[in-house]
Amino acid sequence: MVQRTRWRYSAIAHNYNSCRPMELGAGIAVGAWDGVWARARSAEFVAATDMGDPVYSAFMRYDDSAPLHAAVAADWATYVAADFNGGPFKYSIFPILYSFTASLVVTMGLTVIVFFNVRTKPHRGVPKLLRVAAVLACGNLLTFVVRAMMQLGRDHAEGVVPMNHILDMLWTDTAFNTVDILAVLILQLCQVQTVMRFFTRFQEKRLISLCGILLAVLSQVLWAIPPYSEAVSNHFMPLDDDKDMDVLPPFVYLVRIAQAGSYASFVLMHVFAKKKLCVQSVQMFLLTVLTVVVVVLQPAFFITDVTNVWIDNLSEIFSTTCYMGSTVIVWEWSNRLSILEARRQAQSILGRPVYEDEEQGYNFARYALKIQTALTSKSDEGDTTSATTFAAPRSARFEGKGGPQSPVYVQEGEQQAVMAFNKRMGTRALAHHVLDSIIYYTDKVVVKGLGNLSASLPSKTSSATSVRGRVRKRIGLEGANDVFVYRTKDLVFDSDEDIPRT
């Protein structure tokens, strides 16, 4: 059997006499065609082997068939009864075929879910990455299964059913390893985006994005070094006398276990935090249970991979399937959970929480002024006289995709909202801006208690400052620096007994 990773176990040498040339002595050699035979004084027989191990014979045997050679029968009995590196004989070619086909069916099912069930809005990037990773993983696994079946067909035509040849195809195929590493990298990046959705503050999302992307790229680069080194040198490096590469595979495997455990911890933490929404319906409850199973299965598989050598033989296929399942199912669960959470926030009084770092870029100010401008321009088209409407506010409805929304009150007489943002100013304009700011804050702090505000110096930025002041007033930021002094006062109310009765 092919030994790939010496750090997992020590290779045990098995010497089978039937796998070496055997001297048969004198006899008659019968050909494959009728009537073709020859008498031989001595003959040497070389049996077909599976990289040094006996192979399972695909020839039909009957009661009157010639018995096997004594050495062949003894070695085959030893091979079937032994429990060595590859496990007992039950871990032979047929369970491996079942594993290949089962992984292929699961991967194809997840690919169908990605293309037909995963929403592309409001997160457009992750669904596209999921589709690319699903196509790569499914196509790569399908190509390998077809090649394995064709190789088994050729071996069966020769009367043997080997196992190590198929595993050797899995380990030494550079194209398969390249596509697999790329697919797993994309799936890990999608997992980073999934974890980012669990947090609301931008600073937390940036930190998770930075650390997650660096870990994903680093782990995949380190994971790709051993197989590509083996492909370049045309041999399995960890089995040579050079033991420098023995330290890298276990380290990378520990990194993968840590990544899978961290991802599962984040998902389980979010399940616990949103437990009321997770059990809101039967469908959501079942999807939550499936999510917990797939995220726990991934680190459990890596740990089992270390302890069970037979699973190590198929780790490249199993790990890709586990990565795909833990990414696609968790993303779909997160989509449905976000819909339920948005619906609950829309029905509540406070709505969704808004943090200070979300104000970068004036997102909420842009949205508020956009709505106000649309309402003001729409109402001005139907008004013929404005002099009689300056005193009272009016209400207008905003028509959206979901029908008429609640009325928004706009004060008549105000000028149309114009958004003014900080732009790069020249040296002269910057000097005027600094001087105006000094005078403004001096008026606020010193002169406000003595009289009217002093007039600002004329400058080219006075109009921009006034426009910016109107914008701050409309969005409720004009009183941010005001200081108010209060004092308490006792109020005495008449009791019911003091009220005269008639």
Curated annotation (Swiss-Prot):
GO biological process: ascospore formation; cellular response to alkaline pH; cellular response to pH; fungal-type cell wall biogenesis; invasive growth in response to glucose limitation; regulation of vacuole organization
Bilayer topology: Multi-pass membrane protein
Segments on the Cytoplasmic face: 117-131, 187-206, 272-283, 332-502
Extracellular side of membrane: 1-95, 153-165, 228-250, 305-313
Transmembrane segments: 96-116, 132-152, 166-186, 207-227, 251-271, 284-304, 314-331
Highest rank taxon of the organism: Eukaryota
Region (Disordered): 379-404
Main location class: membrane
GO cellular component: plasma membrane
UniProt entry tagged with the keyword Membrane: yes
InterPro entries, A to Z: PalH (IPR014844)
Annotated compartments: Cell membrane
PANTHER family for this protein: PH-RESPONSE REGULATOR PROTEIN PALH/RIM21, PH-RESPONSE REGULATOR PROTEIN PALH_RIM21
Family: Belongs to the palH/RIM21 family.
Protein's UniProt name: pH-response regulator protein palH/RIM21
